[in-house]
Amino acid sequence: MAQDLIKEQLQGVNLFLIGMMGSGKSTVGPLLAEQLGYRFFDADVLIERVAGKAIADIFAEDGEDTFRDLETEVLGHLAAQTRSVIATGGGVVLRRQNWSYLHHGLVIWLDGSLELLLARLQGDEARPLLQVENLEERLGNLLAQRQPLYAQADLRFPLQADQDPLAIAGELLATIPGLLKPQCSAEQN
């Protein structure tokens, strides 16, 4: 019943999940979408489909700028959708143009601490930006660069180490109504 009310209040507005890699956007997103009866899109998966290769290969063969161009293109298409939960890449906030797309929906920042992200990303060989000697230093630098940009989100959701993804989705659903403007009836206009 509460979910029906939230769906009605959202009126099909997209939810964009932002945050650092390892924050759980691709894990929480489908759970949130399912509870809302929304579609789920993982922007990184779509970028790979458009490019016809893995993100690591895009970085290696074409460079980060090409990846960011593809990311912006895919985000533009996703922003035109409705009733969708969209997990974005961690660096989506770096381009001003991307914010114009993100503002087509409700932007939710899954905020993980450096310690949490380190624990989740240790040994991850799939993420090109993390293929460095000192993972903690790299993550710390990326976090410092991106936190002020993530802070522009409509909602900041601080993550805890042992939080269940389903519980996170539930807490987000409980928080969303407070972010939405009350609907005016025709009689009030």
From Swiss-Prot:
Cofactor remark from the record: Binds 1 Mg(2+) ion per subunit.
Listed SUPFAM superfamilies: P-loop containing nucleoside triphosphate hydrolases
Enzyme Commission number: 2.7.1.71
Binding site for Mg(2+): S26
Catalysed reactions listed for this entry: shikimate + ATP = 3-phosphoshikimate + ADP + H(+)
Cofactor: Mg(2+)
Pathway: Metabolic intermediate biosynthesis; chorismate biosynthesis; chorismate from D-erythrose 4-phosphate and phosphoenolpyruvate: step 5/7
Gene Ontology MF terms: ATP binding; magnesium ion binding; shikimate kinase activity
Record's keyword terms, sorted: Amino-acid biosynthesis, Aromatic amino acid biosynthesis, ATP-binding, Cytoplasm, Kinase, Magnesium, Metal-binding, Nucleotide-binding, Transferase
Residues annotated to bind substrate: D44, R68, G90, R146
InterPro entries: P-loop_NTPase, Shikimate/glucono_kinase, Shikimate_kinase/TSH1, Shikimate_kinase_CS
Localization annotation: Cytoplasm
GO CC terms of this entry: cytoplasm
Protein family per UniProt: Belongs to the shikimate kinase family.
Biological role: Catalyzes the specific phosphorylation of the 3-hydroxyl group of shikimic acid using ATP as a cosubstrate.
HAMAP family: Shikimate_kinase
Annotated protein name in UniProt: Shikimate kinase
Organism for this UniProt entry: Synechocystis sp. (strain ATCC 27184 / PCC 6803 / Kazusa)
